[in-house]
């Protein structure tokens, strides 16, 4: 699954550490999500969307390759 977490996080003026703390996850988890190495759980995806003020489908996209 592809995502725009990194771009949206930067637009919001947040560091990876800030986002991780607010979501209750490690910085490594944020890095993995941003680099498409880890697909978050539905709960975490919803928390990310809420934090960024967006819908989940505005952040995460199916990779149709």
Regions found by a protein language model. Give the residues of each.
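Short, charged recognition helix plus adjacent turn
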Residues: 61-65
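Hydrophobic micro-packing sites on short alpha-helices
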Residues: 45-49, 59
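Short, Lys/Arg-enriched C-terminal cap helix and immediately downstream tail that follows
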Residues: 8, 42-43
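Key DNA-contact positions within bacterial/archaeal DNA-binding proteins
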Residues: 17, 28, 57
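Recognition helix of helix-turn-helix/homeodomain-like DNA-binding domains
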Residues: 25-38
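Short basic helix-loop element that most often maps to the first helix and adjoining turn
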Residues: 4-22
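Residue cluster at the C-terminal edge of the helix-turn-helix DNA-binding motif
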Residues: 22, 51-52
């Amino acid at each position: 699954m592809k995502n725009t977490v990194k771009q949206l996080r930067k637009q919001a003026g947040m560091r990876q550490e800030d986002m991780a703390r607010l979501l209750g996850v490690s910085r490594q988890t944020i890095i993995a999500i941003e680099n498409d190495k880890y697909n978050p759980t539905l709960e975490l995806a919803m928390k990310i969307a809420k934090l960024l003020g967006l819908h989940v489908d505005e952040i995460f996209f199916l990779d149709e390759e």
